[in-house]
Amino acid sequence: MPSPINRTKIVKKKTTKFNRFQSDLFKRVGASWRKPRGIDNRVRRRFSGSRAMPSIGFGSAKATKDVCPDGFKRFVIRNVQELEVLLMQNRRYAAVIFHGVSAKSRKAIVERAAELNIKVTTPNARLRSEERE
């Protein structure tokens, strides 16, 4: 199994949950974030004491964005031929098998990934332990 190319520490700056304005006051207003667009809205005008709006400052660092805790980025694989793309990038990307791939194709993908020294995130998913006879 390849080790990741660099294990920079993933820092989550501020994991604020952004709820919709007045979602705590009215049941009909869901908590899912919507940008306020009213002319008098105090959240849109960023008054002190009002809730924060999502902005670019809450984002992750560019070096660790989309990096999973094991140090790899994910790349979705649909067939055996797509593994060839990861041949030179096997220390940066890990393969994720697409959800609609059959068990027979999954087995072939996992075997080929082992030959190419590519990490597969869930190699045993949806594989039978014994074949039916």
Swiss-Prot record:
Keywords for the protein's UniProt record, in alphabetical order:
Ribonucleoprotein, Ribosomal protein
Out of the domains of life, which is the source? Eukaryota
Note the SS bond partners: none
Please give one Pfam family short name: Ribosomal_L32e
Q: Does the keyword Ribonucleoprotein apply?
A: yes
**Annotated Gene Ontology cellular component terms:** cytosolic large ribosomal subunit
InterPro entries under this entry?
Ribosomal_eL32, Ribosomal_eL32_CS, Ribosomal_eL32_sf
GO MF assignments: structural constituent of ribosome
Task: Give a GO biological-process term.
Answer: translation
The entry assigns this protein to a family as follows: Belongs to the eukaryotic ribosomal protein eL32 family.
Q: What is this protein called?
A: Large ribosomal subunit protein eL32
Q: What is the lineage of its organism?
A: Eukaryota, Amoebozoa, Evosea, Eumycetozoa, Dictyostelia
Q: What is the gene called? A: rpl32
